[in-house]
Amino acid sequence: MTDSRYIGRFAPSPSGELHFGSLIAALGSYLQARANQGIWRVRIEDIDPPREVPGAADTILRQLDHYGLHWDGDVLWQSQRHEAYREALTWLGEQGLSYYCTCTRARIHAVGGIYDGHCRDLGLGAENAALRLRQTRPVLQFSDRLRGTLIANEPLAREDFIIHRRDGLFAYNLAVVVDDHFQGITEIVRGADLIEPTVRQISLYQHFGWQAPDYLHLPLALNGDGNKLSKQNHAPALPEGDPRPEIVRALRFLNQAIPEEWQALNIDDLLAQAVANWQPAKIEHSQMAPAEL
């Protein structure tokens, strides 16, 4: 990268409306970018049509705007980036860094749940096959700005993981790396549920010969059952009314200072003060339920 300016991003999938857990990730990445006088980009990760909800992407963008989280530049849509992903796959193939695999989930489960390289040297064709990375640069640990050095699950880190699915869809790890590199992302601020795939993504950066970004993984908001707030767990959508109470609730969750007279501030001024007071070192590492705050 020739530009040393901070560039962050928020990259939701359009599988439903934003909820409080989504707001934490969006707000954390926004504040980190603005506190570093940086750029904050938004990307819609719409590469998995079976999981997408019609109209959700437009709703997400309206929600961000309503909550004062205004992004820089154009929104990047992964559904418009297929050619870039194909080029990346072609390059990996030309370098001998990928191969086709016809192993089923049942077979992988039968050998312990970690792919054992069964198809690595079989020279299979593309028919009814997934494409796997031929892992030559496993990443066994990485540094997180909040959590310090994180150690990977070594068998998982060494696994030849899928980069193009059997059903013809591009794998998440490939798409996110290609797009983060394309957008010049210098730091990724996101939820702790994405810690595990980070070593795979850094490994892809190394295979491509690209500089990996820095990482900061935020704690997850939990529901009353101790599960992550998510669209799959039917977390309620963000309220459509006054956005300020939810922003304050998210700031409290992130252990940030709250202006005493926040009710007198409009949303833009509230966020400006949040940027000025932003201290990521104060964020608690553990997941928690919002009701406990």
From Swiss-Prot:
L-glutamate binds at R9, F10, A11, P12, S13, E45, Y172, R190. GO terms for molecular function: ATP binding; glutamate-tRNA ligase activity; zinc ion binding. It holds the Pfam family tRNA-synt_1c. GO terms for biological process: glutamyl-tRNA aminoacylation; tRNA modification. A motif ('KMSKS' region) lies at residues 228-232. Binds 1 zinc ion per subunit. Keywords: Aminoacyl-tRNA synthetase, ATP-binding, Ligase, Metal-binding, Nucleotide-binding, Zinc. The keyword ATP-binding applies. Its cofactor is Zn(2+). GO terms for cellular component: cytosol. It is an enzyme of class 6 (ligase). The keyword NADP does not apply. InterPro entries: Glu-Q_tRNA(Asp)_Synthase, Glu/Gln-tRNA-synth, Glu/Gln-tRNA-synth_Ib_cat-dom, GluQ/Sye, Rossmann-like_a/b/a_fold. Zn(2+) binds at C101, C103, Y115, C119. Its EC number is 6.1.1.-. A motif ('HIGH' region) lies at residues 12-22. ATP binds at K231. NCBIfam families: PRK05710.1-1 (NF004312), PRK05710.1-3 (NF004314), queuosine_YadB (TIGR03838). Belongs to the class-I aminoacyl-tRNA synthetase family. GluQ subfamily. Catalyzes the tRNA-independent activation of glutamate in presence of ATP and the subsequent transfer of glutamate onto a tRNA(Asp). Glutamate is transferred on the 2-amino-5-(4,5-dihydroxy-2-cyclopenten-1-yl) moiety of the queuosine in the wobble position of the QUC anticodon. This is Glutamyl-Q tRNA(Asp) synthetase.
